[in-house]
């Protein structure tokens, strides 16, 4: 009966140790040199026998999974535009660097069973990127205590390392731009739900507070749920409405069309996130991009640099800029 084809059998035929075969096939660099003759002998045996090592064997010998987890911290907003941009960018960047991506969805059971830790202990992942984390996600503290490599993407939480887009100053700029054009009755549709929204709120208030703005709060500000907030904001008779995201701004625009309120002649309007519809609605909305793809690419790059070269995982901020459209045209057409 033929012997089973595995790393040990390849090592026997190539006249070297199983660990040498593993290092040759994985490309892992170690302090133990491998001669070119030995490397070629291993590759020749593998080619002759059409051998592909078991992923379990490779992980056992290399002590690496070659996989980075991408964890959506909670089960809500799975159809978010920025989530899809982030996941695609992470997959693309990791693949280019020799890693695969394991998509994961956070849930109460996921946390209760300690899957965020067990994935590392089972050698299923080498690192973890967490998208959309919030203060209530205490499993982040457990990751930090265990010393496993992880990075937050889009939201900051405490001292945990994160890659995110600047969002306070951009809201201040958009709000101040409305004020500079004469707006005094300012309304805001805002949320306190997570660091990104709180930064947007802070920027809005920094510019608008001298004018006693009317602020209307929601949670995730999803288009299907934000119509009542749009009505409440318009009922306050504003000459500018600053929205924390584009979906809220779209709701305001729809209500303005029904009420005969002209944008931007009667009302200045801004949003946030640069979703696709914001550019193609009847009055294209001035907004800003959360830089999801850029943040995700940097996050993947930092994680790989940490795993391969020991680079520290640190918080990084990416700048943002206004995207001027018809709802708040750029001054002087510049």
What are these regions (language model features)?
Residues 1-63:
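N-terminal helix-turn-helix DNA-binding module of bacterial transcription factors
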Residues 20-22, 60-77, 185-191:
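Short beta-strand segments enriched in small/hydrophobic residues
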Residues 94-106, 186-188, 205-225:
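Short beta-strand elements in bilobed, periplasmic/extracellular small-molecule ligand-binding domains
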Residues 162-188, 198, 223-231, 249, ...:
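Hydrophobic alpha-helical segments within soluble ligand-binding/sensing domains
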Residues 230-334:
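Flexible loop/turn connectors
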Residues 174-214, 312-328:
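An alpha-beta-alpha
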């Amino acid at each position: 009966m033929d012997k089973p084809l595995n790393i040990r059998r390849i090592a026997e035929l190539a006249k070297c140790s199983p660990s040498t075969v593993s290092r040759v096939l994985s490309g892992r660099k170690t302090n133990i040199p491998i001669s070119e003759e030995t490397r070629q002998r291993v590759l020749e045996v593998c080619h002759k026998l059409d051998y592909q090592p078991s992923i379990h064997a490779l992980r056992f010998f290399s002590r690496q999974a070659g996989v980075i987890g991408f964890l959506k911290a909670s089960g809500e907003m799975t159809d978010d535009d920025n989530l899809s941009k982030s996941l695609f960018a992470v997959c693309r960047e990791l693949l280019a660097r020799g890693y695969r991506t394991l998509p994961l969805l956070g849930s109460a059971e996921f946390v209760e069973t300690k899957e965020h830790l067990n994935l590392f202990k089972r050698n299923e992942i080498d690192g973890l990127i967490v998208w959309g984390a919030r203060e209530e996600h205490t499993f982040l503290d457990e990751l930090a205590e265990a010393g496993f490599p992880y990075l937050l993407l889009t939201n900051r939480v405490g001292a945990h390392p994160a890659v995110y887009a600047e969002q306070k100053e951009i809201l201040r700029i958009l709000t101040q731009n409305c004020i500079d054009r004469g707006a005094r009755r300012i309304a805001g549709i805002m949320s306190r739900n997570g660091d990104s929204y709180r930064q947007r709120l802070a920027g809005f208030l920094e510019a608008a507070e001298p004018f006693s703005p009317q602020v209307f709060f929601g949670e995730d500000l999803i288009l299907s749920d934000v119509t009542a907030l749009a009505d409440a904001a318009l009922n306050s008779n504003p000459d500018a409405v600053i929205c924390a995201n584009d979906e809220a701004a779209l709701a305001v625009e729809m209500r303005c069309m029904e009420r005969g309120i002209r944008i931007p002649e009667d009302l200045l309007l801004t949003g946030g996130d640069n979703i696709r519809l914001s550019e193609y609605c009847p009055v294209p909305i001035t907004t800003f991009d959360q830089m999801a793809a850029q943040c995700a690419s940097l996050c993947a790059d930092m994680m790989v640099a940490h795993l391969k070269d020991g680079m520290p995982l640190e918080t990084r901020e990416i700048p943002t800029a206004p995207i001027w459209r018809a709802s708040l045209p750029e001054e002087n057409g510049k």
